[in-house]
Swiss-Prot record:
General function of this protein: Component of the NOP7 complex, which is required for maturation of the 25S and 5.8S ribosomal RNAs and formation of the 60S ribosome.
UniProt gene name: YTM1
Nucleus keyword on record: yes
Positions of region (Disordered): 205-228
CDD domains in alphabetical order: WD40 (cd00200)
Protein name, entry field: Ribosome biogenesis protein YTM1
Family: Belongs to the WD repeat WDR12/YTM1 family.
GO molecular function, one term: ribonucleoprotein complex binding
One GO term (biological process): maturation of LSU-rRNA from tricistronic rRNA transcript (SSU-rRNA, 5.8S rRNA, LSU-rRNA)
Gene Ontology CC annotations of this record: nucleoplasm; PeBoW complex; preribosome, large subunit precursor
UniProt region (Sufficient for interaction with ERB1 and association with 66S pre-ribosomes), positions on chain: 113-491
Classification of source organism: Eukaryota, Fungi, Dikarya, Ascomycota, Saccharomycotina
Length: 491
């Protein structure tokens, strides 16, 4: 049978942790014409045979449902027939292939969408398993969605689409929002400000955080009376230092630090605790200017007149064009990364506050994401593609171009990236082409493309967030928070 050119010798292997999905790694011959579906049938048949043997021995008699699988050869997802793979890689049917199988990625279907009053620029989520919760003193039951909007308002949505809280203080478009803890959030916007907010979560207050503020209130800091009952959406502090719009944020709960991306060419470095930062005098507002401002701006200016101000721990200067994205290294909190319209990715030592590596690409970079388990940095560009970089490979000089892989599929700017919470090889991207795409770094094309509920791609998508409980959350010009989810989408 091994001489039959229509057959090839293979063996299956898997890294699935579920023991019930593992088959014996015994060599067998299969037709070279098989694709994913045919191979999936074979694996399920082998699993069913094993199940039958276990049932005869009295070990397990529970009925097993077929499981769809994806297949990898030499780390590459099989998207064609085995024959096409052999031809493309210059192999013959005499080869002996080891084929890895994993749970298939099923199409993410539309679940819900929530109406907002203006364009949605940024999204974040919180659930019981995220570090924003596990690093706090609170336990939570229900996941929430945080949104930032072009009307300057930050909102918290529950899973029914109800707006539970509003955070009003920004005088221009909000560009990024992040959870710090269940009772703390941070936002930034075109008004050049970073704002720390406090609130209750499902009626519960983090007593540790409240005790800190009580102690400071007793010391007479800023003359604020923080002994009062907590209010939804109260600005805890305004963080000032940027001289242009602030468009992205990153939070590290371990070190209690924040990074911000500014159009003033700076990367801001802040603390989640305002007591760690130097005070700034509260400005005296010109009554003549205030009186001629819009009603909204006048009200916000008067409110801000009593709010404490803080300066950054540091402003990291090195980019030559506006900074678009910032992240902390998930494996080393003393390292940060930033991307800019100057085409570069910079690596920052957050202890010495110095840039330690610069790598140059060919296009403006608009978003950044780390995939720590596979040692890659993904960047979205103005050239419509996504680049994958290995941060361990140092650029030989400041002008060198280091790109590992280029993922092509979007037809406009790639402005948002979010990692899969389950699969270290997967992430999602949002684009001005009106779509969200799901990617696996082992495939050269996107796995799925998500449009809006009505199938439209006319509205730009700005924000994307992939939550383990909620699913894929996206928002943009259509003023809707949309949720898509597929069974085992990334398992």
């Amino acid at each position: 049978m091994s001489d039959d050119k229509n057959q090839i010798k293979i063996k299956f292997t898997t890294n699935e942790s579920d023991e019930s999905l593992k088959v014996e790694e015994t060599p067998l011959y299969v037709p070279v014409t098989l694709k994913r579906y045919g191979l999936s049938e074979i694996v399920n048949h082998l699993l069913e045979t094993q199940k039958a043997l276990e049932s005869e021995s009295g070990e397990d008699d529970e009925e097993r449902k077929p499981v769809p699988f994806n297949f990898l050869i030499n780390g590459e997802l099989l998207r064609t027939s085995i024959s096409d793979y052999l031809t493309r890689n210059g192999l013959s049917s005499e080869a002996f292939l080891t084929i890895e199988y994993t749970r298939a990625i099923l199409p993410p279907s539309f679940q819900a969408s929530f109406q907002n009053d203006d364009w949605i620029s940024s999204l974040d989520s919180i659930n019981r398993n995220l570090s924003a919760v596990t690093s706090s003193q609170l336990t939570i039951t229900n996941p929430k969605i945080l949104s930032g909007s072009y009307d300057g308002i930050v909102k918290t949505y529950n899973m029914s689409g109800k707006v539970e809280k509003q955070y009003m203080g920004h005088s221009a478009a909000v560009k990024s929002v992040k959870w710090i803890s269940p009772t703390r959030i941070v936002s930034c916007g075109n008004d050049q400000q970073v704002r720390l907010w406090k609130t209750a979560y499902e009626g519960v207050v983090d007593q540790n955080e409240e005790d800190e503020e009580e102690n400071e209130a007793n010391e007479g800091d800023d003359g604020d009376n923080d002994m009062e009952k907590i209010e939804d959406g109260k600005t805890l502090a305004i963080l000032e230092g940027h001289k242009a719009p602030v468009v992205d944020l990153a939070v590290n709960q371990q070190t209690k630090r924040i990074l911000s991306a500014g159009y003033d060419l700076n990367v801001g470095f802040w603390s989640t605790n305002y007591k760690d930062m130097a005070k700034i005098s509260i400005p005296e507002y010109d009554s003549n200017v205030i009186s001629t401002s819009s009603k909204k701006r006048r009200k916000l200016a008067l409110q801000d007149a009593t709010i404490r101000r803080r300066s950054p721990l540091s402003l990291l200067l090195g980019h030559t064009e506006p900074v678009e994205g910032v992240i902390f290294d998930e494996l080393d909190a003393t390292v940060g990364y930033s991307v800019s319209q100057d085409h570069t990715i910079k690596t920052w030592d957050l202890v010495t506050l110095r840039c330690v590596d610069t790598r140059t690409t060919g296009f403006s970079l608009l978003s950044i994401l780390q995939l720590p388990q596979v040692n890659l940095i993904a960047t979205g560009s103005s050239a419509r593609h996504i680049n994958l970089h290995d941060p361990r490979v140092s650029a030989s000089n400041t002008n060198s171009e280091v790109v590992n892989t280029k993922l092509v599929g979007h037809t406009n700017f790639v402005v948002g990236l979010s990692a899969s919470p389950h699969n270290s090889n997967m992430f999602a991207s949002s684009s001005h082409d009106g779509t969200v795409k799901v990617w696996d770094i082992r495939a050269d094309k996107s796995l799925y493309t998500i449009t809006r509920e009505d199938g439209s791609t006319k509205s730009k998508i700005f924000g994307v967030c992939w939550d383990s409980e909620i699913g894929l959350i996206s928002g943009g010009e259509d003023k809707r928070v949309q949720i898509n989810k597929g069974s085992d989408i990334s398992k």
